[in-house]
Amino acid sequence: MKKIMLIIFILFFSNGAYSTFFYRYDSVDAEDAFKIGFIPSGYNRNMYEHIRGTSCFEGDATSHFISTSASEPMAHVMAESATPVGMMYYLYTIRPTRNFYNSVNSLRAAFVRTNDWRFQSTILDYMHEQEWLALGGIDTEQIYSARAYRSRGPDQQAEFIAEYLNPAYFDADAGPNSGNYYIPNLSRYESSERSACSICSIDSMSSVFKRDTTSDIARWRK
């Protein structure tokens, strides 16, 4: 019964529909992003290891995914929590393509297939992020714009500075992948600790931050 209720809960809150654009917080300068896009830090295609952070910069920095969110407000929350007061960040507006996979839907498929509670735990930890992961990175022509902000700290609306449109942007009738990304069975000793990074781009090493907002705030205050 508990498993049935969990599946109903996840189905209700998961992203069956998606927005026209996705969003990504980063400290990478707009000019650089418009030239090269977002390149992943490595070739590890294990989505679970990216979500949990073991293949990001808090781990071995080998992830082949780039994180985005279908929620613009959530991208702002994460940026404001992680960026020190007075420092700039960019909010990128991105057109998704078939290499974008929904993390919650993929975790749910793995949970249903394996009945492994670690997938269930990860869903409940991160479903609020409305995350879509771009396998292999994000091309420059997919980046519509970059909005520059100056942080005022956690729970404070950042100061808007300017919006920059990408001259290389190409508009196309495309959307993210409607299927689930296959996540292999976990090893017996696979960690389920809540520690992960949403950056995982080779140009973003200075912007490493935990994805849990509470952890973000604690880290920012240090």
Please give the residue ranges for each predicted region:
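NAD-dependent ADP-ribosyltransferases
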Residues: 15-222
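Sec-dependent N-terminal signal peptides
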Residues: 4-13
